[in-house]
């Protein structure tokens, strides 16, 4: 997907919170292009407001604290391997703590693969300046798929 969309991609498997933290640190301090990345794409299982690493659930609040201000201006996007279902206060907490511009994902897990919609979403993020314009264009292009996967964006 990254190659087809001309996106910079870094693949790193993480099986523990320490592994995720190590990968984040490497990304932040060893990758000279980090500031240019608009989207941090996370493909990991989990439940509505948590991710699962090595059979342990970590809340998005814990993940926000791990990212602590280091995602300034980025969009954190979750594939549909986990549900993203946040209350307004939870979303705002995540955004405030991480510094992210938005958090996005799906209300439906892997009944259908989100690859096609993810690809279009990433391309639109490169073209559009405002996340509201991205979402509007995404729904115009793929309304049925957005509905099927229950696409969500909190900003």
Where are these regions (language model features)?
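Well-ordered, non-membrane alpha-helical segments in soluble/globular domains
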Residues: 1, 21-26, 54-65, 86-91
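Active-site-proximal C-terminal subdomain of hydrolase catalytic domains
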Residues: 84-155
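Alpha-helix boundary/capping residues
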Residues: 27, 70, 138-142
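A domain-level signal for caspase-like cysteine endopeptidase catalytic cores
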Residues: 1-37, 72-79, 91, 95-98
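A short, glycine/acidic-enriched catalytic loop
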Residues: 45-75
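Short His-Asn-centered micro-motif
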Residues: 42-43, 54, 76-82, 106
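Short loop/turn segments at strand-loop or loop-helix junctions that form parts
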Residues: 38-46
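Short acidic, S/G/P-rich loop/turn micro-motifs used as interaction or catalytic elements
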Residues: 17-19, 46-50, 82-86, 109-111
């Amino acid at each position: 997907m990254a190659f087809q969309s001309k996106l910079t991609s870094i693949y790193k498997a993480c099986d523990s919170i320490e592994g995720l933290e190590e990968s984040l640190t490497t990304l932040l301090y060893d990758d000279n292009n980090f500031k240019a990345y608009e989207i941090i794409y996370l493909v990991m299982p989990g439940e509505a407001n948590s991710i699962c690493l090595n059979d342990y659930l970590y809340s998005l609040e814990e993940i926000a604290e791990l990212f602590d201000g280091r995602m300034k201006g980025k969009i954190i996007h979750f594939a549909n391997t986990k549900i993203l279902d946040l209350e307004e206060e939870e979303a705002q907490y995540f955004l405030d703590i991480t510094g992210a511009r938005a958090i996005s994902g799906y209300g439906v897990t892997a009944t259908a693969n989100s690859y096609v919609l993810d690809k279009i979403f990433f391309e639109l993020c490169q073209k559009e300046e405002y996340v509201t314009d991205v979402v509007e264009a995404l729904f115009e292009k793929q309304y049925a798929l957005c509905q099927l996967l229950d696409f969500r964006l909190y900003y």
